[in-house]
Amino acid sequence: MSIQSILRKETLKKKDKNIDLQENNINDLVVSASRVIAPLWPISTFAAHHPWMGLEKQSFERVANWLKEARNVDIYPSASMIHSAKAKGEIEESFLQMALSRWLDSQSFHIPRKKVEQFCQAALKLEELPSSLLSSPQLNKLAEEMSYINTESMKDSFLQPVSSFIENQKGENLSDILNYHIIKWCKLYLDDSGSSWTMPNREQGLYRAWHHLIKFDPALSKTERKVLKDWPEDALIALTKALSELGISESNMQAYLEGHLLSLPGWAGMVRWRSQQSIEEQELLIEYLAVRLSMELAVVKPYLPLKNQKVEKKVSIVPLIASWIYWGDISTREWLQMSATEQSELLAFAYRFDENIRKKLWLEAWEQTHAEQLKKKISSKQRATNDKKRVVAQLAFCIDVRSEPFRRHLEKLGPFETFGIAGFFGLPIATTELGSNDSHPSLPVILKPKHQIKELTDENECKSYEQRKMVGSSVRYTFKTMKQNVLTSMLLPEVSGPLLGLQMVTRSFVPRRVGGFIRNLRKNMLQKPDTTFSLNHVHDTNCEIPIGFTKEEKVNYVRQALKMVGLTEGFAPLVVMCGHSSQSTNNPYAAALECGACGGAAGGFNARVFATLCNLPEVREALSAEGIKIPDDTIFAAAEHKTTVDELEWIYVPELSETAQEAFDCIEAIMPNVSQHANRERLMQLPNFKTKIKNPSKEAHRFAEDWSEIRPEWGLARNASFIIGQRELTQDCDLEGRAFLHNYDWKQDERGDILANIIAGPGTVAQWINLQYYASTVAPHYYGSGNKTTQTVTAGLGVMQGNASDLLPGLPWQSVMQSDRETYHSPLRLLIVIQAPTKYIEHLLNNDFTFREKVQNGWVRLASVDPEGRWKNW
C-alpha cells in the first residue's frame, strides 16, 4: 500500500467514523465491483472482448439468471432465434430430449415423472401463456384461494441505485437524469479526438476537473449545486461520504457500486480501460464512481430517506398456476382437490423450470447439434497423414475464420500446404511505421509488448516520404480545425461544398472506380520507399521497452512459432507468412474487421518481421544446430490476405531461389481463380445476393469502396469452433468459414507446453471474439451497438445512439443480423476441438485452472479427437 493510500485511509477514518474500512476499504470494493464490466477499447483499435470476462468464476447459467433478475437482460437466445435455427436444421430434437432428461435427473421432485415430462415438453415449445388465461377471473380467484402457499423461498432481492426508485414532478426517473449528467462529464473528460476546447483542469483527473466545474453547471438546480458546494476535493473521501449519506451499509457497498457500473456499462468500461493504461489514471474508476455517486446524492437528497432500497421480487403464483393449466392440463377443479403439499410441489417445479432453463436446454441442444455436425464432417474426411502430395509452397494464415474458405480454395487449386497460426506470429511487439511517431501494440490485448520494432529506410528517402505525408496530414488538420472553430465552421461548407458534393455523388454511383482511383492516387503520391526493420537489440532510455531483438530472442521466437504449427521439417521452396487486413470505406468499425491477434490492426507488419527473421543466416544456423534444418533454397516471404476482397497482396518478397521463384509464379497464376471462388462463396452469404454473381471480384471491390455500404463483409460472424490439430484433420472439409484453425502436432509437444500456450493465447482471443458476437446477438440493446445508420461517433472513442446514450460496447446490428427478424450469427459458445491423446487433455485441464474453470462453468465447450480418430466430449 502506498503512503498516499495510508494517509487517505487515515483521513477517511477521521472524516466518518461510521464506516469501518480496516479490511474492506473502498479501493478494494471498487476493484471487486469492477468485475461486472469489461474494459472497452476505443473504436479505432476495436479489440475483441466479452462482457463477462470478470464473471467466469461463476457458471454461465448463474450469470444469466443474475442478469435477468437484476438488469432484465436475457443472455440466452430468444424464442424466435431458436425456432428459426430449428427450421434451418441447426437443432436436432433428439438432443433437446437428452438435455431435458439430464436436467430432470438433476432435480428433486415428488411429482409423477410422466406428468413432469408432459409439462416440460409443452413448455419447451416456448409459447407465451395466453393473456386471456392470465387475466381470467377463475384463475385469479384460484390464486386468492391458494394465498396460503408459502413462496418466501422464491423471493429474490437486489440492491438498486437510490435514483432508480424516484421520479420527479415531471414523471422523469432520476436515474435517467443522473445518466444524462454522467454521459456529459465522461464525454468532456475522455474526449480523444483533439477538440479545440478541452475540459479545463483535465490534467488533474476526472474528479478534480469535475469538482472545479460543477458549481457552474447550469443543468443543476440551486438546491443540487448547494449539496455539492463544500464537497470534498478528494475522490475517495467524496465516494465514501456519498455512500454514507445515501444510507448504504458496508455489507451492501459492493453490490451498490456494481449497480452503478452496470447502469452505463459502456462509459464505465471505457473508464476501466483508461485506468489500466497509465499510472496517472490508475484510480480513474474510483473517480468515475465518486462523480456518479456525488451527483446522485445531489439529485436525490430532497427525497431522502427512502424506506427500502432493495428491489424485492416476490413471485406471483398466477403464472405458475397458469403454466400447469396450459402446459400440464391440470384444471382449476383439480387444483382445488390437491393438498397444500401437492400444490406447493407443482408451483416450486414450475418456478424452477422457468424461461431461462427452457432456453438453456435449447441452447445446449443447438450446441450439441453443431458439435455432432462438425464431428461428422471431420470423421468423413479422415485420411492417412503419411499420404501427402508434393507441395511447392507453404502458406501460414491467421486462425481467423475468414481464412478457412480462402485456404480451402487455395489448396484445392494448387500444390500448396497451408497452416493456421495466431496472426501476430508469436511476436510480442509494438510497431512503429515509417514516418510515424506513434507505436501500436501489435499483439493480442491480453499480452503486453516486449519489443519495439521500427520501420526504417535511407535518411533522405525518409525525409522525402515524411514531407509527402505531411502534405496530406496538413490538409486533414486544416479541415478539422476549420470544422471545430466557431467562425471558420460557418465558412467551411462554402469552401468545401463543391468538392465534397462531387465526391459524394461519385462515391455513391461509381464507388469501385472512384475508390480505386483515390486509393491509387494516394499510393502514388506517397510513394513509400523500400524499408527495413530495427531488428537488432538497442536499449534506448527514451523507450519503455527495448528496440529490436537479441540473437537469442530472434531464434527463440522463430523456433517457437515453427514448433507451434509443427513446421520443423519438410520445408517447401517458398514459405509465405500471411497476415490479414480488411478494406472498407466510411466504417467506424473498420478495426473490428482487422486482425484480433494484432490488437485491431492489419497483420502484415508482423508477417513481414517474422519472414525477415526466418531468412537471417544466424537464425537458420542456430535452428539447424537444434535439428530444425531449413534448406538453403527455402525462402520466407510475407503477404497480406485482404479479407473483404479475398486477395493476397505481397508485402515482402526477397531475392528468390529458382525453385522459390517457380512456386511464387505458381501462386500468382492461380490467385485470381482462388479469389473468384472465395469471393463467390462469401458474397452469397450476404443478404444482397441470392442469385448468381457474374463477377464476384468486381462485386467484392464495390462493397469495399462503397461508402454507403453498411455491411462490406460479415467479419467473424457465425464463428463457432476452434480446431487445434494438423491440417489433415480438416483438409477438404467445408467448414463454412465458421472455424478458427490452429495447426498443432502433439507428437512434437512431449510436455504439453505448446498446447497450453495455444489455449492461453489464441484460445482466449477466439473465446473473446466468440462471446462478443454472442452477446451482441442475444442482447443487442445492452451489449451491442444498434443500427449503424443511426450511430454517432463521439469523442473519438466509440459510438452512441443520438447524443446522450451509453457508449455502445458491442457490434452493430449489421454485423450479426441478416434482416430485422432473422439473425445471421448463430449464438453458440465456442467449441474447442483438440487433436491429441486423452492424456494431453487431462494434463491441460489439471495444470491450467483458468481454462478448466471456463469449461466447467460453461463459458467454452471442449472436445478432443485422439490419434485413432475417436471423438470425446469433455
Swiss-Prot record:
The lineage of its organism: Bacteria, Bacillati, Bacillota, Bacilli, Bacillales. This is Probable inorganic carbon transporter subunit DabA. Forms a complex with DabB. Disulfide bonds: none annotated. GO terms for molecular function: zinc ion binding. Its main location: membrane. It is found in: Cell membrane. Zn(2+) binds at residues 398, 400, 580, 595. InterPro entries: DabA (IPR018752). Pfam families: DabA.
